[in-house]
């Protein structure tokens, strides 16, 4: 906790180039709004308070971030970054320091920001700059005798100033008492007719406040999002960072460029992940887990030694040790699979508990079911759990064998060791240890002829 650090996040921009009705800062990167990434960074820095200045989209921004401990200030009309900061000044403690961040710059690291806050703590002006080979569009850092003298916006810069490659990122930290004074002195006599926050640099120089510059470890940390193309670019940068961390932790990625983690992914030892897999929410993979190609996992815990074949979808479920799932399996919310459970191709399981050693290998639907150990479910089996108004549970006890093409009309219980013959429609409980079946008597109609379609003339 940094008891005197206030973080101000500017998030009022419309984002015209996004071509969207959604406020720019609410567009998602890695499964989280852009603003959410910045808020998480602020929280990691231990700020005493975090204030978000919002504008376009009205209350959509505060509503989207309602779970975070934030204060919000509306910038009803956008007249530049200096004007945005002015709206929030009453929220900032005079005896603290203020770090200014941007809601559309989501990849900034805490290790980059910490030195800026430390500079402000020491009474200095902490300024984040970066050197770019092609600095078009950015404000230039003008130095005199190696010291920062001012920042000139691109549209206001002379030819000589446009040749400067050190540019302003907009991210800064200053003692709040200075910030409040300088903001009151800003003028809008520039090409844009706006109040530039960057103009406080010249005021700091005038007042003899030392400007201490720092640069990020990676240039992409300060990249902003103004278009869908830039959003896609930052998504790939972020996913590459995630992939590199996983590789460093010993995870085998068949292709690091074809991985999407949209939340948190925690892996044990010797985990292997094939291409085009998506991980959403919180996903935990135990030792030796193998994930086949094109799987989607959302809020899932998978125990050691389990293998998922291609195109398996698991959502809000727990998978036990040494399981085998897929290909083309769907595990829906509320499902718990115990050890050594096999779920095969085109099987869907919802809100069910499947105990150890049971197998559902082909073309089946199991919903709202409690299944014991060592159960074998034949191909084409359906638990009919919904009567049009209510859902009912099916109970299948240990060591049951269910023949293919069987329907179990819930509520119904199949006793321990029972066998259901193929094609059975079970509407009453099946007793333990017995064969239960229901089917029409087979008959052969002698002399029956299949209808023949008449041949077309010509």
Swiss-Prot record:
CDD domains: GT2_GlmU_N_bac, LbH_GlmU_C. It is an enzyme of class 2 (transferase). Residues 229-249 are annotated as: Linker. Pathway: Nucleotide-sugar biosynthesis; UDP-N-acetyl-alpha-D-glucosamine biosynthesis; N-acetyl-alpha-D-glucosamine 1-phosphate from alpha-D-glucosamine 6-phosphate (route II): step 2/2; Nucleotide-sugar biosynthesis; UDP-N-acetyl-alpha-D-glucosamine biosynthesis; UDP-N-acetyl-alpha-D-glucosamine from N-acetyl-alpha-D-glucosamine 1-phosphate: step 1/1; Bacterial outer membrane biogenesis; LPS lipid A biosynthesis. Mg(2+) binds at residues 104, 226. The active site is at residue 362. GO terms for biological process: cell morphogenesis; cell wall organization; lipid A biosynthetic process; peptidoglycan biosynthetic process; regulation of cell shape; UDP-N-acetylglucosamine biosynthetic process. Its cofactor is Mg(2+). Residues 1-228 are annotated as: Pyrophosphorylase. GO terms for cellular component: cytoplasm; membrane. It comes from the Bacteria. It is found in: Cytoplasm. One of its GO terms (molecular function) is UDP-N-acetylglucosamine diphosphorylase activity. Its EC number is 2.7.7.23, 2.3.1.157. Residues 250-458 are annotated as: N-acetyltransferase. It catalyses: alpha-D-glucosamine 1-phosphate + acetyl-CoA = N-acetyl-alpha-D-glucosamine 1-phosphate + CoA + H(+); N-acetyl-alpha-D-glucosamine 1-phosphate + UTP + H(+) = UDP-N-acetyl-alpha-D-glucosamine + diphosphate. Acetyl-CoA binds at residues 379, 385-386, 404, 422, 439. UDP-N-acetyl-alpha-D-glucosamine binds at residues 10-13, 24, 75, 80-81, 102-104, 139, 153, 168, 226, 332, 350, 365, 376. Homotrimer. HAMAP family: GlmU. Catalyzes the last two sequential reactions in the de novo biosynthetic pathway for UDP-N-acetylglucosamine (UDP-GlcNAc). The C-terminal domain catalyzes the transfer of acetyl group from acetyl coenzyme A to glucosamine-1-phosphate (GlcN-1-P) to produce N-acetylglucosamine-1-phosphate (GlcNAc-1-P), which is converted into UDP-GlcNAc by the transfer of uridine 5-monophosphate (from uridine 5-triphosphate), a reaction catalyzed by the N-terminal domain. This is Bifunctional protein GlmU. It comes from Thiobacillus denitrificans (strain ATCC 25259 / T1). The lineage of its organism: Bacteria, Pseudomonadati, Pseudomonadota, Betaproteobacteria, Nitrosomonadales.
């Amino acid at each position: 906790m940094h008891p005197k650090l206030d973080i101000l996040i500017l998030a009022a921009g419309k984002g015209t180039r996004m071509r969207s009705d959604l406020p720019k800062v609410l567009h998602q990167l890695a499964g989280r709004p852009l603003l959410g990434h910045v808020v998480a960074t602020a929280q990691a820095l231990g700020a005493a308070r975090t204030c978000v200045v919002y504008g376009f989209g009205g209350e959509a921004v505060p509503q989207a971030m309602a779970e975070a401990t934030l204060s919000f200030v509306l910038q009803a009309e956008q007249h530049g970054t200096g004007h945005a900061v002015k709206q929030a000044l009453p929220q900032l403690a005079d005896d603290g320091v203020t770090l200014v961040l941007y809601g559309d710059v989501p990849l900034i690291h805490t290790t980059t920001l910490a030195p800026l806050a430390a500079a402000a703590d020491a009474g200095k002006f902490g300024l984040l700059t970066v050197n770019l080979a092609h600095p078009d569009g950015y404000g230039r850092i003008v130095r005199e005798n190696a010291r920062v003298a001012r920042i000139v916006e691109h549209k206001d810069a002379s030819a000589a100033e446009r040749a400067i490659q050190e540019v302003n990122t907009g991210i800064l930290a200053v003692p709040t008492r200075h910030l409040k004074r300088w903001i009151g002195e800003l003028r809008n006599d520039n090409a844009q007719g706006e109040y530039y926050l960057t103009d406080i640099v010249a005021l700091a120089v005038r007042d003899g406040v030392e400007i201490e510059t720092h640069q990020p470890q990676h240039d992409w940390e300060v990249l902003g999002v103004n278009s869908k193309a830039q959003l896609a670019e930052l998504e790939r940068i972020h996913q590459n960072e995630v992939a590199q961390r996983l590789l460093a932790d010993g995870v085998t990625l068949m292709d690091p460029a074809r991985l999407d983690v949209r939340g948190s992914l925690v892996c044990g030892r010797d985990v292997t992940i094939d291409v085009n897999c998506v991980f959403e929410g919180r996903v935990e993979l135990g030792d030796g887990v193998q994930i086949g190609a094109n799987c989607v996992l959302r809020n899932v815990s998978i125990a050691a030694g389990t293998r998922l074949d291609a195109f398996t979808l698991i959502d809000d479920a727990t998978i036990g040790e040494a399981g085998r799932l897929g290909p083309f399996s769907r595990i829906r919310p509320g499902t718990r699979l115990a050890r050594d459970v096999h779920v095969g191709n085109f099987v869907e399981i919802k809100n069910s508990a499947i105990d150890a050693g049971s197998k559902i290998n082909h073309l089946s639907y199991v919903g709202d079911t409690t299944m014991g150990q060592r159960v074998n479910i034949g191909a084409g089996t359906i638990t009919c759990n919904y009567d049009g108004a209510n859902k009912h549970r099916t109970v299948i006890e240990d060591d049951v064998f269910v023949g293919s093409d069987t329907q179990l009309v819930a509520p119904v219980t199949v006793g321990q060791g029972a066998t259901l013959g193929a094609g059975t429609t079970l509407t009453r409980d099946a007793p333990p240890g017995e064969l239960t079946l229901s089917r029409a008597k087979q008959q052969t109609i002698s002399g029956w002829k299949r209808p023949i379609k008449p041949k077309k003339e010509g």
